[in-house]
């Protein structure tokens, strides 16, 4: 064998599980995870996606599973597949995220309920998208018109359910809720009507919702004209009509139902949305219509009764799902390729030859209903694809480490996302099968044996060059086919035909390479707007695409929508002896390094640990710290110099332990390490945060090795040290008295079975400059109400110790909740938190709870005279694009230096303090000034960011709860 080519044969170091069935990457159309619409998140990129590919049956199938009828199956028309990873039974519990991690989704249906009717879910529960209750993403891995040449018939399916940015991996098991009172993360059963029967006549209803008046607009600030990446949609149809279809005698097979209904397109028209029982049409038929069809299997005559049951407004929530399916078809007509859940144009790929990368431009698009009506949300998306196939990566690994080649390959490849360009699908690599090669064969659905070499040659015209390469394994979740059969098995991929996606780790550390990439991906507002204009022009010039929209009476505006927003007043920053109004750039680094902080802690007893070869950098750092300590009002003594003979982990840990044992008054441990060492950093933090609690600061020698930057770096280090010792840097004016602000965020630890780590940070003084922090570890499905009680009660007790009173108002900022979980948070999880107040006699504070959503697609442009530019920091929008269900607003608090202005979405789910919209917006903006790791505004309120840093440190580095001795200091900065 060629010595420069890896020996692919042999036993895998991580032996793959032996499955009975094997699937080819082009065999079965890969549907995405069945998403609970309440989940509001997109699926991971690592699964097969298909766009119009024919189905190839599996080598093995399980028993047929009974499917439910409803919105979940509405893509299944005329042989269109809408399979899912689990049997479509009502009692199966989709995974979701509660306020504190992994719980049950809001789309929970209990077993003690009567069987549900085949109709849409409550529109209030059809929550989707990044911020709107009626949004459904159209870039999803469902097929359009597969198996049917008639593109006018519009089946609907799970893709109609809402998605947002990303889906968390569901836990490995599901639990059925008890009949007892609801607990944390356990939402109510959905209201559904009983299944229709011939003895129960259908009643025609006309949908007309009176919009409840919700005061959500503020008035403070300067008006400003803004552009949005939303396009107004005009509905020309008067209504959408819902019909109930009954087959007599009953026809169990859905595909037969679709076929029989298709035979009567002369009556129903060629624009339909049918799920096997419920039919939606843009035209009005008779109240009751009787049709006849002949079953082809036995020539039996079947009577089809179509009865009108509901007249919907064209902007109804129930219409949003199949409007999105319509727009997916429009994108297909523009020759856009569906990859993952977005559409891309490979023909316009930008090639970075020096970095061996391709960038595919594309769009993420979804239709949603907001306070301003029906909109198309379109965002520019880019797919980064490497020119290196997996086989090239394997060869490179072989050259570097021949002895442990298979180990290194498995370690590097497993978990990565690859794309197969012959069908534009993405897969996650779950394992490597070192015992199979393309010369091996598999069984087709018709029973024929075929080798992988023959399969690719016959189906794609591809000649495989490397015949001895191993095969990559992708294990999709179990799902059903079109006939309810359970699909199992593995998808085997050829490394030669699989291309790596994403940015290589080595490239992420290359400043020049990342700069080149950012120039292509980070578009200015003008470029972003031009890309959206291009999409609208392509749709307008494509007659087929325009006609597809007009079939349902939809027409797009010619340009993005423009509204009026406001710029909130600039805030006053308070230091110890001075205060000042921030500039438009919202940066006050000069002031905080020139004037004393509010509270500084003298640093008299501290130790500096450094390897011998970093002695010069250590002395320069200490000299600079002594120079800059005076201006910020901090007193410091020389450190205890501890020189290390080497930079091994054991040396650092053993030396720090012995020093802490000998010197009992050490306030701060400062360690200088040689380069970015994650293992060493983690060992130091575990020692100083868990085993021997003491504030610690780890400094990379590279950051202090440049004399020109040493002063600015030392200033940041000293400010961080002051925070970790309990100091207070700056504050803002807080008009609300006796206020406690809480930040909560969740980190999911993939290395520990996706257990949730909750970061909890609360203010414990009246000026919001002193913080109390706790961490809660939660396993999947584990109740943590008791743990939360410890956090909240502990923070209230600490507040009382500091102020000699309890807070009158508590404002909670909760990060990481999707739209689909908002009702669960409001109805179940907040009451659980309020029960904590019972620990104090006669104590019922006013409470305000905000859900903070960062992963949104909404972009803001400032409408300048010539073109769009980046909006001013402090820009707020509280109308038109806001939710129909909640009091919410969008706030761009930070200064955007590159790219577009992506605001943060704030949804108020509780307001017993009766704060006005102006108070909510101003308080939120003030808190965005309070993150002491950056002398400027950040994208989210400071307690949210603190909670995120705490949860990440505890879940990713420590894997353990920090010592209680550190809970009153910001040790996690």
Curated annotation (Swiss-Prot):
Q: Do the record's keywords include Cell cycle?
A: no
The record's keywords, sorted A to Z, are: Biological rhythms, Cytoplasm, Developmental protein, Differentiation, Endonuclease, Hydrolase, Meiosis, Metal-binding, Methylation, Nuclease, Oogenesis, RNA-binding, RNA-mediated gene silencing, Spermatogenesis, Translation regulation
Q: Which GO terms describe its biological process?
A: germ-line stem cell population maintenance; meiotic cell cycle; negative regulation of circadian rhythm; oogenesis; piRNA processing; piRNA-mediated gene silencing by mRNA destabilization; positive regulation of cytoplasmic translation; positive regulation of meiosis I
On this chain, the residues bearing Symmetric dimethylarginine are 47, 76, 97, 102, 146, 158, 165, 551
Classification via Pfam families: ArgoL1 (PF08699), PAZ (PF02170), Piwi (PF02171), Piwi_N (PF23278)
Tell me which SMART domains the record gives. DUF1785 (SM01163), PAZ (SM00949), Piwi (SM00950)
The cofactors it requires, by name, are:
Mg(2+)
MF-aspect GO terms: metal ion binding; mRNA binding; piRNA binding; RNA endonuclease activity
Predominantly, its location class is cytoplasm
Assigned EC number: 3.1.26.-
List where Low complexity composition bias occurs.
34-48
Q: Using the record's annotation, list all stretches that form the PAZ domain.
A: 389-502
Its PTM note reads: Arginine methylation by PRMT5 is required for the interaction with Tudor domain-containing protein TDRD1 and subsequent localization to the meiotic nuage, also named P granule.
- GO CC terms on record? chromatoid body; cytoplasm; dense body; nucleus; P granule; perinucleolar chromocenter; PET complex; pi-body
Q: Where is the Piwi domain?
A: 668-959
Where is the region Disordered? 28-65, 162-199
Active-site annotation = 745, 783, 815, 948
UniProt family annotation: Belongs to the argonaute family. Piwi subfamily.
Q: What does this protein do?
A: Endoribonuclease that plays a central role during spermatogenesis by repressing transposable elements and preventing their mobilization, which is essential for the germline integrity. Plays an essential role in meiotic differentiation of spermatocytes, germ cell differentiation and in self-renewal of spermatogonial stem cells. Acts via the piRNA metabolic process, which mediates the repression of transposable elements during meiosis by forming complexes composed of piRNAs and Piwi proteins and govern the methylation and subsequent repression of transposons.
Q: What is the designated name of this protein?
A: Piwi-like protein 2
Record the organism.
Homo sapiens (Human)
Q: Which gene encodes it?
A: PIWIL2
């Amino acid at each position: 064998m060629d010595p420069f080519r890896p020996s692919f044969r042999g036993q895998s170091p991580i032996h793959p599980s032996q499955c009975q069935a094997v699937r080819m990457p082009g065999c079965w159309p890969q549907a995405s995870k069945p998403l609970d619409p309440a989940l509001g998140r997109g699926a991971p990129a690592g699964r097969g996606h298909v766009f119009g590919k024919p189905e190839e049956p599996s080598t093995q199938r399980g028993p047929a599973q009974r499917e439910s009828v409803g919105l979940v199956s509405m893509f299944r028309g005329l042989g269109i597949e809408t399979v899912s990873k689990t049997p479509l039974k009502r009692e199966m519990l989709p995974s979701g995220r509660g306020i504190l991690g992994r719980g049950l989704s809001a789309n929970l249906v209990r077993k003690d309920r009567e069987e549900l009717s085949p109709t849409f879910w409550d529109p209030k529960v059809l929550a989707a998208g990044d911020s709107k209750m009626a949004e459904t993403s159209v870039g999803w891995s469902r097929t359009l018109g597969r198996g049917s040449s008639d593109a006018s018939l519009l089946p609907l399916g799970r893709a109609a359910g809402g998605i947002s940015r990303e889906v968390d991996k569901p836990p490995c098991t599901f639990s059925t809720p008890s009949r007892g009172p609801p607990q944390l993360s356990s939402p109510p059963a959905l209201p559904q009507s009983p299944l229709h029967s011939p003895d129960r006549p259908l009643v025609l209803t006309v949908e007309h919702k009176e919009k409840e008046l919700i005061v959500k607009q503020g008035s403070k600030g300067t008006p400003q004209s803004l552009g949005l990446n939303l396009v107004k949609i005009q509905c020309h149809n008067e209504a959408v009509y819902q019909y109930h279809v009954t087959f007599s005698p009953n026809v169990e097979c859905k595909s037969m139902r679709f076929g029989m209904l298709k035979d009567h397109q002369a009556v129903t028209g060629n624009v339909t949305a049918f799920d096997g029982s419920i039919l939606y049409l843009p035209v009005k038929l008779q109240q009751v219509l009787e049709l006849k069809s002949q079953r082809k299997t036995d020539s039996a005559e079947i009577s089809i009764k179509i009865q009108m049951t509901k007249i919907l407004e064209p902007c109804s929530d129930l219409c949003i799902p199949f409007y999105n399916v319509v727009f997916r078809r429009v994108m297909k007509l523009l020759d856009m390729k569906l990859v993952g859940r977005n559409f891309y144009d490979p023909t316009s790929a930008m090639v970075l030859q020096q970095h061996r990368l391709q960038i595919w431009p594309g769009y993420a698009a979804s239709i949603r209903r907001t306070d301003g009506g029906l909109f198309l949300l379109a965002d520019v998306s880019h797919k980064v694809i490497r020119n290196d196939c997996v086989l090239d990566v394997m060869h490179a690994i072989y050259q570097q480490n021949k002895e442990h080649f298979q180990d290194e390959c498995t370690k590097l490849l497993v978990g990565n996302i690859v794309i197969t360009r012959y069908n534009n699908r993405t897969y996650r690599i779950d394992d490597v099968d070192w015992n199979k090669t393309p010369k091996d064969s598999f069984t087709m659905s018709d029973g024929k044996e075929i080798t992988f070499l023959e399969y690719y040659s016959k189906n794609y015209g591809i000649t495989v060059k490397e015949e001895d390469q191993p095969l990559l394994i992708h294990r999709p979740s179990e799902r059903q086919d079109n006939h309810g059969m359970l699909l199992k098995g593995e998808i085997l991929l050829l490394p030669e035909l699989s291309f790596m996606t994403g940015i290589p780790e080595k490239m992420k550390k290359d400043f020049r390479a990342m700069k080149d990439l950012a120039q292509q991906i980070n578009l200015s507002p003008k470029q972003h707007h031009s890309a959206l204009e291009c999409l609208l022009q392509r749709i307008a010039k494509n007659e087929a695409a325009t006609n597809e929209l007009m079939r349902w009476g939809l027409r797009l505006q010619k340009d993005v929508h423009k509204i009026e927003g406001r710029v909130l007043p600039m805030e006053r920053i308070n230091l110890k002896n001075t205060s000042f109004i921030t500039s438009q750039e919202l940066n006050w680094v000069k002031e905080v390094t020139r004037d004393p902080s509010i509270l500084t802690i003298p640093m008299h007893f501290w130790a500096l640990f450094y390897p011998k070869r970093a002695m010069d950098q250590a002395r320069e750092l200490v000299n600079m710290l002594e120079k800059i300590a005076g201006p910020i009002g901090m007193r410091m003594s020389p450190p205890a110099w501890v020189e290390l003979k080497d930079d091994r982990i054991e040396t650092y840990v053993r030396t720090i332990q012995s020093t802490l044992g000998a010197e009992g008054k050490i306030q701060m441990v400062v360690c200088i390490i040689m380069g970015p060492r994650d293992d060493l950093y983690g060992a130091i933090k575990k020692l100083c945060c868990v085993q021997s609690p003491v504030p610690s600061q780890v400094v990379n020698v590279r950051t202090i090795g440049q004399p020109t930057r040493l002063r600015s770096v030392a200033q940041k280090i000293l400010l961080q040290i002051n925070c970790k010792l309990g100091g207070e840097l700056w504050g803002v004016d807080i008009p609300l008295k006796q206020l406690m602000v809480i930040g909560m965020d969740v980190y999911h630890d993939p290395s520990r079975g996706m257990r949730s780590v909750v970061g909890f940070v609360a203010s414990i003084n009246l000026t919001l400059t002193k913080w109390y922090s706790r961490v809660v570890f939660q396993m999947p499905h584990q109740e943590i109400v008791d743990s939360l009680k410890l956090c909240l009660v502990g923070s209230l007790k600490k507040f009382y110790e500091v102020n000699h009173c309890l807070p009158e108002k508590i404002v909670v900022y909760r990060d990481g909740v999707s739209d689909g979980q908002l009702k669960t948070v409001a109805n179940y999880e907040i009451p659980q938190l309020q029960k904590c107040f019972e620990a104090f006699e006669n104590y019922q504070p006013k409470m305000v709870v905000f859900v903070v959503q960062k992963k949104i697609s909404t972009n803001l442009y400032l409408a300048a005279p010539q073109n769009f530019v980046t909006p001013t920091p402090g820009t707020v929008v509280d109308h038109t694009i806001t939710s129909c269900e909640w009091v919410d607003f969008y706030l761009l608090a930070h200064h955007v230096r590159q790219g577009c202005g992506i605001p943060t979405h704030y949804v108020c789910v509780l307001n017993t303090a009766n704060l006005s919209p102006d108070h909510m917006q101003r308080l939120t903006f003030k808190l965005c000034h309070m993150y002491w790791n950056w002398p400027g505004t950040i994208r989210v309120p400071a307690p949210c960011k603190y909670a995120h840093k705490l949860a990440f440190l505890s879940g990713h580095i420590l894997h353990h709860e920090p010592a209680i001795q550190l809970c009153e200091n910001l040790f996690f900065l």
